Amino acid sequence: MQKNILVRSIAALSGIVMLASVAACGDNTATTTDNSSSSDSTSKSTPISGNFSGAGASSQQAAVEAWIAGFQGTNPEAKIAYNPSGSGAGVQTFLTGATAWAGSDKALADDEVEQSKSVCTEGTAFDVPVYISPIAVVFNLKGVSDAGKHINMDAATIAKIFDGKITKWNDPAIADQNKDLKLPDTAITVVHRSDKSGTTQYFVSYFEDVTPDNWTYDLSENWPNEVGQGAKGTSGVISTVKQADGTIGYADFSQVGDLGTVAVKVGDKYNEISAEAGSKVIGDSKQDDTVKGDNRIVIKINHATEAEGAYPIVLVSYDIVCPAYKDTKQAEFAKAWLTYVTSDEGQKAAQDAAGTAPLPSSLKSEITKSIEAIKTK
């Protein structure tokens, strides 16, 4: 996701800022910040000071910028840099010990948990959910999107469109769900990500869980078929959809702008996308109890939710940290950072900056327990 952000170099961290890697979602603009607004959620007894860096998911970029500003309100001597190099690159950098934390759109793999023993002085690295963002099915259709109207679709219809099985906007499968709309006989042009993308994986996992008969591809961060045209990054998808009538794509909700969005069928209703609706599906989901390692909070999204008002297509992004660090200052920072980021104040800052969904209250006690596991002495 992209924002107009102020980038200021910090010499002590230039090695991290200049990491050359490919973003999982969006562009690779490194973010550093050294002054801020106030925060009441960060540790007040001992302000954090020093230079700290993270790298990873570009989906988090705008939120991280807001979090840095908020964190530094009560920790003005903390100099923080974040390189949105992509989830995979960020995790690998963290596993070399070069960063205090990684941002990732997917949970650690078993081999990455094992590898973390080389950088964590005790135990293994763990993931904490910090960022929830609804994924919009966006479209550009004359007379509909430009009139501010939604189009209703169930999972099977969306899957068939993105698999090239439905090719006209007035196809009966769409028209029967939108009897109040006059849909044109316009060809559908699918726009998908051309780059490796966590957003893609979360998007197609919805099909895999809800309508598997209509989506038979292996789950991957790469787009699996030759339907439509590819575009790099969230901005590329949005730009391409805007350019032509009849287009449809998928993108982080914060980037939708004035494009039309699909209201997705949940139970017997069609729910429009919103931050709050995205949070509801996470509140109706469970933790994945199959992951290895202590203190990990990995969400198994309940795409088949029937929760009132829930929007089922969402991305969950994590911060990955150690339970113990060689440098005590790193541990103190990681603990204070996660405490702020997952607080009500931190989540509100992310929502204001990036349109994210807040962490549901049902997760708060587990998140606090995991953060408390970080040893600072």
Each model region followed by its residue ranges:
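Extracytoplasmic ligand-binding site segments that recognize negatively charged/polar headgroups
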Residues: P134-V138, V144-S235
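C-terminal motif of bacterial Sec signal peptides marking the signal peptidase cleavage site
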Residues: A20-A24
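Ligand-binding pocket segment of bilobal, Venus flytrap-like solute-binding proteins
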Residues: V91, K196-T290
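Extracellular/periplasmic juxtamembrane helices and adjacent flexible linkers that interface
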Residues: K44-S49, N178-T186, I301-K377
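Sec-exported extracytoplasmic/periplasmic mature domains
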Residues: E65-E77, L95-T99, F139-G143, A159-D171, ...
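Bacterial N-terminal signal peptides that target proteins for export
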Residues: M1-A12
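Periplasmic-binding protein-like
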Residues: T124-F139, A263-Y318
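N-terminal segment of the mature folded domain
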Residues: N28-T29, D34-N35, D40-A175, I238-T240, ...
